[in-house]
């Protein structure tokens, strides 16, 4: 993450995630009974993954973080209020989900969805 604190604020505002042990370099986020870890780019100084991060956008390309049982309409409205990019408005899908695609500042696609 470019900015862990900003990402924590985004996830709390849009998805009601709870932040724990927050610092500029690290945070634990909870979403229901799921746990996420956020790390700043700087914490990867000796990690081989660091060499894979592009210096220029796009970042996060190809990853979708799916959050089931999250109302896509509500999440989209909250995301708009944060200035996030809505890639796909809430849409009914033939596989039985209603979902949206929200792009955060760090370039990750967050996909809130509910069953139809």
Features from the language model and the residues they span:
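Short glycine-/small-residue motifs
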Residues: 109-112
């Amino acid at each position: 993450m470019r900015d862990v604190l900003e990402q924590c604020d985004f996830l709390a505002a849009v998805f009601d995630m709870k932040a724990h042990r927050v610092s500029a370099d690290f945070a634990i986020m909870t979403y229901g009974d799921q746990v996420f870890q956020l790390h700043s780019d700087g914490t990867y100084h000796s990690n081989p993954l660091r060499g894979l991060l592009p210096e220029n956008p796009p970042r996060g390309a190809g990853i979708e973080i799916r959050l089931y049982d999250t109302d896509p309409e509500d999440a989209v409205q909250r995301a708009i209020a944060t200035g996030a990019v809505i890639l796909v408005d809430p849409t009914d899908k033939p596989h039985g989900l209603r979902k949206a695609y929200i792009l955060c500042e760090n370039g990750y696609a967050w996909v809130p969805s509910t069953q139809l």
